[in-house]
Amino acid sequence: MSESVHTNTSLWSKGMKAVIVAQFLSAFGDNALLFATLALLKAQFYPEWSQPILQMVFVGAYILFAPFVGQVADSFAKGRVMMFANGLKLLGAASICFGINPFLGYTLVGVGAAAYSPAKYGILGELTTGSKLVKANGLMEASTIAAILLGSVAGGVLADWHVLVALAACALAYGGAVVANIYIPKLAAARPGQSWNLINMTRSFLNACTSLWRNGETRFSLVGTSLFWGAGVTLRFLLVLWVPVALGITDNATPTYLNAMVAIGIVVGAGAAAKLVTLETVSRCMPAGILIGVVVLIFSLQHELLPAYALLMLIGVLGGFFVVPLNALLQERGKKSVGAGNAIAVQNLGENSAMLLMLGIYSLAVMVGIPVVPIGIGFGALFALAIAALWIWQRRH
C-alpha cells in the first residue's frame, strides 16, 4: 500500500489503534523489566553500584546506534521495523529469564528500544498529518505514561512475588506488542534504496543533525525536548534523596508514588495540548516550559506530603503541554527535510545526551556534598532560565 492511502485517515483508524496498543505493551514491558531486573540483581547479590549500569547500557544503546536507526526506520515499512524492534526486546527479556547475564539481556532490550523509537514516532506522520498529528502525539504520550505507571507497579509487585514471574510477564508484554505490530498497515518506505555503508550512514546522520540544527523550528524542538527529558530523568533521581530529607519519610514507596503523580499530570497536559495547540501555534507551549522550572523550585521547599503531590502533578501537566507540540513540530518539519525516522533518531541522540549530562551534573553536586533542597532550587531555576532563553532565541530567529 502506498503511504498516501493512509494519510489523513481517522485518528482511530485500525492502523492507529495498532500503533497505540503496540506502544502501550512495549513501554509496559520496558518499565516492568527495569524493576524486575533490579530485583534480580538484588536476589543474585550484585553490588548496589551496579544498578545504575542498567540505565546506562539502555541509554548508551540509543546514543551508539543513533546514526543508524533513523535510516532503518525510513528504509523499510515502519510497522515492520517496530515489529523487529519489539522482537529484539522479547529476545532480551527471554534471555534474562533463561539465566543469561542480565546486563547483556538488558543491552539487547536497549538496542531494540533504540530501533523502535524513530519508527513509532515517524509512523504517526504517515498515518495522519496536520492538527491530527498533534492529537496522535497526545495519544502516544498518554499510552506511554499509562504504561509507565502500570508497568512500574506490575514489575515491582510481581518481583516481590517471584522474580521469574515478573520477567516472564515482561516477555509476554513484548510478545503482545509484536502481535499488535502485525495489524499496522504496511506503508511504503519513506526513503528506500539508501546506502548501508556504515561510514556513509554516519556521515548522513551527521548531515541530518546539521540540517535539523540549521532549521530554526527543528532546532527549537530538539533543544526543548532534550531539556525536558533530561530534566525529567534528573527529577526522578532527585526525588529519591529529597523525600527522606524534606518529608522525613524513609520508605521506598513514597518516591514511586510522587513520580506517578508527574506521569498522571503528563497525560492531562498531553490531552490539553492536543486540543489547544497546533503546529502553527507551537509557541503557546513555552510558558508552560518556564513554569515547570518555577514549580520545581517551589516544590523543593515543601515539607508536607499533600502539597508535594499537588505540585508534582502540576509539573506533569505543564510537562505534557510543553513537550507534545514540540514532538509534533519535529516530526512534521523533519519528515520534509531529512525523513521522520532520521529526525527522531537525532532527537533521541539529543535527549539521551541531555539525560547523561544532567545526571552527571546532579551526581557531581551530590558527590561534593551540596544538600538536596538547594540542588532542587538551583535545578528548577536553571531549567526555567534555560527554557526562557530558548523562547527568546526562537523568537529572534
Swiss-Prot record:
The GO terms this record gives for MF are: lysophospholipid:sodium symporter activity
Q: Quote the CDD domains the UniProt record gives.
A: MFS_MefA_like
- Name the residues that span the membrane: 18-38, 53-73, 91-111, 145-165, 167-187, 227-247, 257-277, 281-301, 305-325, 344-364, 367-387
Show the Pfam families listed in the entry: MFS_1
Which cellular compartments is it found in? Cell inner membrane
Gene Ontology terms, cellular component aspect?
A: plasma membrane
How is this protein positioned relative to the membrane? Multi-pass membrane protein
Membrane-side (Cytoplasmic) residue stretches: 39-52, 112-144, 188-226, 278-280, 326-343, 388-397
Q: Which residues lie on this side of the membrane: Periplasmic?
A: 1-17, 74-90, 166, 248-256, 302-304, 365-366
Q: Which UniProt key words apply to this protein?
A: Cell inner membrane, Cell membrane, Lipid transport, Membrane, Transmembrane, Transmembrane helix, Transport
Which family, according to UniProt? Belongs to the major facilitator superfamily. LplT (TC 2.A.1.42) family.
HAMAP family listed in its UniProt record: MFS_LplT (MF_01585)
Per the entry, what this protein does is: Catalyzes the facilitated diffusion of 2-acyl-glycero-3-phosphoethanolamine (2-acyl-GPE) into the cell.
Question: What's the protein name?
Answer: Lysophospholipid transporter LplT
Name the encoding gene, please.
lplT
